[in-house]
Swiss-Prot record:
SUPFAM superfamilies: Homeodomain-like. It comes from the Eukaryota. Induction: By light, UV, cold, drought, ethylene, jasmonic acid (JA), salicylic acid (SA), abscisic acid (ABA), cadmium (CdCl(2)), high salt (NaCl), and cytokinins. Residues 9-61, 62-116 form the HTH myb-type domain. CDD domains: SANT (cd00167). This is Transcription factor MYB32. It comes from Arabidopsis thaliana (Mouse-ear cress). GO terms for molecular function: DNA-binding transcription factor activity; transcription cis-regulatory region binding. The lineage of its organism: Eukaryota, Viridiplantae, Streptophyta, Embryophyta, Tracheophyta. InterPro entries: Homeodomain-like_sf, Myb_dom, Myb_TF_plants, SANT/Myb.
Amino acid sequence: MGRSPCCEKDHTNKGAWTKEEDDKLISYIKAHGEGCWRSLPRSAGLQRCGKSCRLRWINYLRPDLKRGNFTLEEDDLIIKLHSLLGNKWSLIATRLPGRTDNEIKNYWNTHVKRKLLRKGIDPATHRPINETKTSQDSSDSSKTEDPLVKILSFGPQLEKIANFGDERIQKRVEYSVVEERCLDLNLELRISPPWQDKLHDERNLRFGRVKYRCSACRFGFGNGKECSCNNVKCQTEDSSSSSYSSTDISSSIGYDFLGLNNTRVLDFSTLEMK
């Protein structure tokens, strides 16, 4: 259950206070003291809310209120207290006798804040404005340019280039695409002779002559050039007039697929069975 209302809303006055109401409130508090603000309006014969009576007394009618402008000492004290307490105006008002929290807040927003800005001081942090900007920039750069953090990218990167002129400093930011150098990996798997032998064979076919060597010459037993034996496969023929089967080509052309040319291994496919 909540608290019961301090007064009936139907029979309470709202709006500006009259002089008669001020006199009743002042005379009652002088005679009986502040007491309980909930029961004070009925005792004083006022058709007002207890909160309205309290604010009227504290902000306008109490005898120790200071009237007039704030002094320089009060300005300095408000600035020091605001740097320590922030926007806690009720606590600041306790340090300034005769001043209310509402009065101090209004004076801060209308005078003191503008005074600090003219001096180049940030009213929120009470530091120089340039220092706060540089600290924010350094904090942002430290967050983005952390040496322990490395950014991995698989696409084109953008590099910022700043060009400065001699006569006048002109900063121009251009973005140039930096192409990444990746290894050209061929992951295709196939069984075929080396590409050097293919180029050599295509070059020989292009000039119209193909040289065939026997197995002895291919394994190093021959002279390594044109064979002097009477084997048909070792003769030099024109590619246009020669007709040979696929088995002759595979057995006669010197492909070094498994590196057998450097080893002394006999070609059992050319041996005749007796």
